């Protein structure tokens, strides 16, 4: 009896994908474009965590934050007279555990509101020239700005269908979204603090969005305006819960000081 010839798949082991050819490993630095389109990179980023609470002593906590020169902002919750939020920002996420959390634990009756916990990291899109400004300085300056005390914070999760769209379609949707935000910013109505939340939250959010402004109404109008975009109307699986508050304590931002 003749043997059946082995097929190529039977005789040759399947080849493993080649590893990324980036310095012999994976390059996790943020990428941008400098002068004349020259690639630039920076392996630094800001972690930003929002936390919601109830029944704490806001005035006492603000004093503790002041004495500790805390890299954090305290917001009074507009929906809850006893509620407040804390936004911490740092390059080393250990700062939240080692410095911010011990200050919070001094509040004996503090009630933690898990639904408002959001953690993310700043990121570059790829065309930015000044990566330190985009990733570190600008996000910190925005949340510390006393001229924009009103804030709306919420998580966003896209549907998997977005990732199946062509790169060109994704680019168009992001450009539409970004154009609206830019217009509101140029008019002085709102600034945005958007961080990536992949793998950093229990609900697997893609992004954490912070809208900041002098007044609250433009922030609501911006959310409403965004609802009409293709990305939001077709490819957002979940938005919220929304925290709405006004800053009652902010640190003074120093552009020359390096954040922890």
Where are these regions (language model features)?
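Short S/T/G/P-rich N-terminal loop/turn motif that feeds into the first structured element of a domain
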Residues: 2-68, 90-99, 110-183, 214, ...
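Short, well-ordered beta-strand segments in beta-rich or mixed alpha/beta enzyme
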Residues: 48-52, 76-104, 151-157, 196, ...
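A common structural junction motif
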Residues: 69-71, 104-112, 226-235
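Metal- and O2-centered redox machinery and metal/ROS homeostasis
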Residues: 70-73, 185
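A generic structural motif
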Residues: 72-79, 114-121, 233-247
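Intrinsically disordered, low-complexity segments enriched in Gly and acidic/Ser/Thr residues
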Residues: 172-204
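Accessory, usually C-terminal, subdomains that scaffold auxiliary metal cofactors
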Residues: 191-193, 198-206, 211-260
């Amino acid at each position: 009896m003749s043997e059946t010839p082995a097929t190529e798949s039977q005789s040759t082991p399947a080849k493993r994908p080649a590893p990324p050819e980036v310095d012999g490993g994976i390059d996790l630095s943020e990428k941008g474009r400098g002068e004349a389109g020259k690639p630039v990179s920076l392996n630094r980023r800001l972690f930003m965590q929002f936390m919601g609470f109830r029944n704490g002593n806001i005035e006492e906590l603000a004093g503790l934050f002041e004495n500790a020169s805390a890299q954090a902002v305290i917001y009074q919750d507009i929906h809850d007279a006893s509620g407040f939020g804390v936004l911490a920002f740092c390059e080393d996420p250990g700062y939240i555990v080692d410095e911010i959390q011990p200050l919070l634990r001094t509040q004996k009756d503090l009630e933690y509101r898990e639904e408002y916990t959001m953690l993310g990291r700043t990121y570059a899109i790829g065309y930015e020239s000044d990566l330190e400004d985009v990733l570190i300085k600008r996000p910190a300056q925005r949340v510390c700005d006393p001229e924009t005390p009103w804030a709306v914070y919420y998580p966003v999760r896209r549907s998997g269908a977005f990732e199946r769209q062509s790169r060109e379609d994704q680019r168009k949707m992001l450009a539409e979204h970004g154009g609206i935000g830019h217009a509101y910013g140029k008019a002085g109505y709102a600034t945005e603090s958007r961080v990536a939340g992949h793998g950093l939250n229990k609900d697997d959010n893609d992004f954490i969005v912070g809208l900041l402004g002098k007044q609250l109404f433009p922030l609501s109008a911006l959310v409403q305006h965004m609802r009409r975009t293709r990305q939001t109307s077709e490819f957002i699986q979940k938005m919220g819960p929304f925290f709405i508050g006004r800053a009652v304590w902010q640190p003074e931002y120093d552009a020359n000081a390096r954040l922890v």
